[in-house]
């Protein structure tokens, strides 16, 4: 059955049951700060369920486009993980409840889709006896009903509506696993029993403290993955062989030197697995990029745009692995993606955006890979005994010699050649099994930006000084009162001489005008940006700086004729951003002085249109509470709506007025004519920069970081304007929620009953602080849980078999209880990061469940070797893998020899 038919059958069926069909909404949430993307069918209907809006019908159904990107690296490594998917849903808002919802499910599954009754299994919440009775009344055999726990069958976000849920599974048979119903009973990840439908019975309200009351209005919220249903109805090993993905894969094959092999799911050829993986990455990421761009997202360096950029780049790199030639290829498949779906997609627009992103990336990727290989080769012995193309040999050499890849080298490849650090990390870890810690990336980025600014400014100053043509101050700055002016070109220069014209739109030159509205970088404020316009030529102003005579020098790109007048136009949006942040710097200086006293002075500042920094001395590091007091005081100043005043006087006159002045301000100002920027009743400062007309126009002020810059020196980084602060908070909330989710999962690996109760404020600032506190709590809980597990381990460790080879330990035991395996392996893995942990439990006569964990080695590779030797099957990831085997591993020595033979150790 084709995917379009499945989708239509769903919508038509529920329409026949009185449901209103709701068209799929945009992937970009509208007025919902809690989501980066629409990630489920119910996400667009939340206002109906909460009562904020009246639904057009109490019965709704949809097929909703969704994106989830919290686990991008796992795409293609599992049978069903995608970044873009479609969720089929039916919803009742205070109308029908359990009996009708389950009956609808039965009718659709058995009468419409014609599933075999013997292959459908149900899991329910153990305390939900009503659901159990309904299932029995529908003649479901006891053998196909599995009792679930609160963890598996109770939908609860920690605060608000919640309730038990019924999960419906399809059994794909023993060819996907010899193990039977125990997989469902023990909630073991597998490819045999596939969850096709989840029906949530929203009947309780959690007050946030774990107290549950019955809701006055009971609701139904369901979700069925279209890709999963297609996989079953089209009888494919994974979702990637369905008609939603295969046409894209076939199109990729036309460009690749390789072929995608469907049967390799069963054959398990390692080389072909890698080939298939890259086909899957391209097909998945392309679907996401096409749909997200069509809905308004654009590749960029932050938020949604960064995710799209990352997906396109990952797909492009997979294309290189598959031997696809040319600067761009992904954009050619936009139409194929469009044809596999039902949504209106502007193929031309989307294709152009993807092509531009590809071409931009193609300039760095191929050279970057070669440079990366050279950096890896620098670690090899001088006898050239290691082949860089033999990736398993390289991986083994790095492990045996405890070699690492220095992050500073990775950053050098990024800063010098533009090779993205995330791509470097993926190549190292995926292809060479070399870990790369990128946690220091933000710090390196800031240091690199500061260094680049300094070097660039010095280089341009050298250009002007070396010509010795400009003998005095000849240029007037008029930017305090206007952003536009018609000017005469006094000097047109290149790097060696004075010139009369430039020939190319890409030619760089330097201008001094008789008058200019462009502010030059000085006093901690960055230069203005904008255009010079001469006839039809639009000349981009790249940078503005002062020469030794204090003339404003414009570094520009474009065609210019010196003899003609030129229009100078400052970008007003960038100017107002600069003014907000420069005025914000004055206010934060004053607020810091009021909080900490006379010890505060300005050691340095840097303001651009996006943010400000302020460096100051203090004998001890400020507490975050003190920093929040400073932030609060600045916002109070903003809300006072104080008009800015300019006072022109001499340096001596400024001193008599007690104006605040820094050495930097005194150095670049003419002592006979200095400017004081005065915000009455707040602060008066010697300053030549541009400033906001009224404090209210700063809108809002937020401190986003406090860093140490040496002994007793600190730097505040802050942002202004409602738009920038809101975007920052949304981005932080999104990132922090992912961190929190991962921490909760990590804690659950140590204690399955672990959970946290959430209650988020609608205020973004408060919500972000709440999430941060939950992150701190989760980290604290992890330490306690780990300690608790370690205490339990002390009683068991003497029974473990431990073998050591060079720096590698194998920790082994096959006689443990099933329930404790995962937490034991997780604890031992964290406690012994260089060890391979293999623990097992007998689950039936002659059958054993094993769990493998390691931080140094791939747990998945090790478990696959064990499954091959001991007739088993399972799955997992690089740090934790599990499954069953039909033969007991008798002793650690057997494992040691097996892993040594396979080149793991």
UniProtKB/Swiss-Prot annotation:
Pfam families: DHHA1, tRNA-synt_2c, tRNA_SAD
Name of the top EC class for this enzyme: ligase
Predominant location: cytoplasm
Keywords carried by this UniProt record: Aminoacyl-tRNA synthetase, ATP-binding, Cytoplasm, Ligase, Metal-binding, Nucleotide-binding, Protein biosynthesis, RNA-binding, tRNA-binding, Zinc
Catalytic activity, reaction form: tRNA(Ala) + L-alanine + ATP = L-alanyl-tRNA(Ala) + AMP + diphosphate
Cofactor comment text: Binds 1 zinc ion per subunit.
Cofactor(s) essential for the protein: Zn(2+)
EC number of the protein: 6.1.1.7
GO terms classed as biological process: alanyl-tRNA aminoacylation
Subcellular localization(s) per the UniProt record: Cytoplasm
CDD domains for this protein: AlaRS_core
Residues annotated for Zn(2+) binding in this entry: 582, 586, 687, 691
Coiled coil regions, renumbered to chain: none
GO cellular component terms, A-Z: cytosol
Gene Ontology molecular function terms on file: alanine-tRNA ligase activity; aminoacyl-tRNA deacylase activity; ATP binding; tRNA binding; zinc ion binding
Domain of life per record: Bacteria
Cited function: Catalyzes the attachment of alanine to tRNA(Ala) in a two-step reaction: alanine is first activated by ATP to form Ala-AMP and then transferred to the acceptor end of tRNA(Ala). Also edits incorrectly charged Ser-tRNA(Ala) and Gly-tRNA(Ala) via its editing domain.
PANTHER family membership: ALANINE--TRNA LIGASE, CYTOPLASMIC, ALANYL-TRNA SYNTHETASE
Family of this protein: Belongs to the class-II aminoacyl-tRNA synthetase family.
Domains (record comment): Consists of three domains; the N-terminal catalytic domain, the editing domain and the C-terminal C-Ala domain. The editing domain removes incorrectly charged amino acids, while the C-Ala domain, along with tRNA(Ala), serves as a bridge to cooperatively bring together the editing and aminoacylation centers thus stimulating deacylation of misacylated tRNAs.
Protein name stated in the entry: Alanine--tRNA ligase
């Amino acid at each position: 059955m084709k995917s379009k038919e499945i989708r239509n059958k769903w919508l038509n069926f529920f329409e026949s049951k009185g449901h209103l069909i709701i068209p799929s909404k945009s992937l970009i949430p509208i007025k919902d700060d809690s989501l980066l993307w629409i990630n489920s069918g119910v996400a667009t209907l939340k206002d109906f369920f909460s009562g904020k809006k009246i639904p057009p019908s109490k019965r709704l159904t949809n097929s909703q486009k969704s994106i989830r990107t919290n686990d991008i690296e796992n795409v293609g490594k599992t049978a069903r993980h995608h970044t873009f998917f479609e969720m089929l849903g039916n919803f009742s808002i205070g109308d029908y409840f359990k009996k009708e919802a389950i009956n609808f499910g039965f009718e659709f599954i058995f009468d419409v889709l014609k599933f075999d009754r013997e292959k459908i299994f149900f899991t329910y919440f153990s305390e939900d006896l009503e659901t159990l009775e309904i299932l029995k009344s529908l003649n479901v055999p006891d053998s196909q009903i599995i009792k679930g726990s609160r963890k598996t069958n109770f939908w609860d976000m920690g605060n608000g509506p919640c309730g038990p849920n019924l999960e419906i599974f399809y059994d794909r048979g023993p060819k996907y696993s010899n193990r039977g119903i125990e997989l469902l009973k023990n909630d073991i990840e597998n490819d045999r029993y596939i969850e096709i439908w989840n029906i949530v019975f929203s009947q309780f309200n959690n007050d946030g403290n774990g107290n549950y009351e019955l809701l006055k209005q009971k609701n139904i919220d369901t979700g069925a993955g279209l890709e999963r249903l297609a996989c079953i109805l089209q009888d494919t090993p994974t979702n990637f062989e369905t008609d939603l993905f295969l046409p894209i894969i076939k199109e990729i094959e036309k460009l690749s030197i390789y072929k995608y092999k469907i049967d390799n799911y069963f054959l398990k050829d390692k080389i072909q697995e890698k080939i298939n993986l890259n086909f899957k990455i391209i097909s998945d990421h392309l679907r996401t990029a096409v749909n997200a761009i069509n809905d308004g997202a654009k590749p960029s360096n932050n938020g949604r745009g960064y995710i799209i950029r990352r997906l396109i780049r990952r797909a492009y790199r997979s294309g290189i692995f598959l031997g696809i030639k040319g600067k761009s290829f992904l954009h050619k498949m936009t139409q194929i993606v469009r044809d596999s779906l039902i949504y209106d997609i502007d193929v031309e627009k989307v294709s152009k955006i993807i092509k531009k992103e590809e071409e931009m990336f193609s300039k760095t990727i191929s050279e970057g890979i070669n440079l990366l290989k050279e950096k890896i080769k620098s670690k090899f012995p001088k006898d050239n005994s290691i082949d860089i193309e033999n990736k398993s040999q390289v991986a083994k050499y790095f492990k045996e010699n405890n070699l690492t890849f220095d992050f500073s080298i990775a950053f050098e490849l990024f800063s010098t050649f533009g090779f993205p650090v995330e791509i470097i990390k993926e190549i190292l870890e995926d292809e060479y099994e070399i870990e790369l810690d990128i946690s220091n990336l933000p710090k390196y980025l800031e240091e690199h930006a500061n260094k680049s600014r300094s070097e660039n400014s010095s280089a341009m100053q050298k250009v002007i000084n070396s010509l010795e043509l400009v003998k005095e101050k000849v240029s007037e700055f008029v930017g305090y009162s206007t952003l536009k002016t018609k000017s005469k070109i006094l000097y047109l220069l290149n790097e060696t001489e004075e010139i009369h014209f430039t020939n190319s739109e890409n030619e760089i030159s330097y201008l001094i005008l008789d008058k200019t509205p462009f502010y030059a970088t000085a006093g901690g404020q960055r230069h203005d940006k904008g255009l010079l316009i001469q006839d039809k030529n639009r000349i981009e102003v790249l940078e503005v700086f002062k020469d030794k005579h204090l003339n404003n020098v414009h570094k520009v790109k474009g065609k210019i004729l010196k003899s003609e007048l030129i229009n100078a136009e400052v970008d007003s949006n960038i100017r107002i951003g600069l003014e907000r942040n420069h005025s914000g710097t004055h206010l934060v200086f004053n607020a810091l002085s009021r909080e900490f006293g006379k010890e505060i002075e300005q050691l340095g500042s840097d303001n651009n249109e996006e943010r400000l920094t302020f460096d100051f001395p203090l004998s001890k590091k400020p507490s975050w509470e003190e920093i929040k007091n400073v932030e609060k005081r600045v916002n109070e100043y903003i809300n006072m709506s104080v008009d800015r005043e300019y006072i022109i006087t001499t340096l001596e006159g400024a001193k008599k007025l007690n104006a605040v002045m820094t050495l930097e301000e005194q150095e670049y100002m003419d002592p006979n004519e200095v400017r004081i920027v005065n915000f009455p009743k707040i602060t008066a400062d010697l300053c030549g920069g541009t400033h906001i007309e009224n404090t209210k126009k700063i809108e809002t002020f937020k401190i986003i970081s406090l860093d140490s810059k040496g002994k007793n020196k600190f730097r505040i980084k802050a942002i202004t304007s409602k738009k920038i602060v809101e975007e920052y908070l949304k981005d932080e909330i999104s990132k922090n929620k992912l961190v929190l989710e991962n921490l909760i999962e990590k804690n659950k690996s140590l204690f399955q009953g672990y959970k946290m109760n959430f209650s988020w404020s609608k205020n973004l600032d408060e919500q972000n602080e709440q999430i941060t506190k939950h992150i701190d709590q989760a980290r604290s809980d992890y330490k306690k849980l780990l300690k608790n597990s370690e205490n339990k381990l002390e009683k068991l460790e003497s029974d473990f078999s431990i073998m050591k080879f060079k720096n590698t330990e194998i920790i082994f035991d096959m006689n443990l209880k099933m329930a404790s395996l995962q937490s034991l392996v997780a604890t031992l893995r964290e406690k012994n990061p260089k060890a391979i942990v293999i623990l097992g439990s007998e689950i039936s006569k002659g059958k054993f469940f094993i769990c493998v964990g390691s931080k140094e080695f791939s747990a998945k590779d090790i478990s696959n070797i064990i499954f091959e030797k001991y007739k088993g099957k399972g799955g997992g990831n690089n740090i934790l893998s599990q499954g069953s085997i039909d033969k007991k591993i008798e002793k650690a020595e057997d494992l040691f020899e097996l892993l040594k033979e396979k080149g793991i150790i």
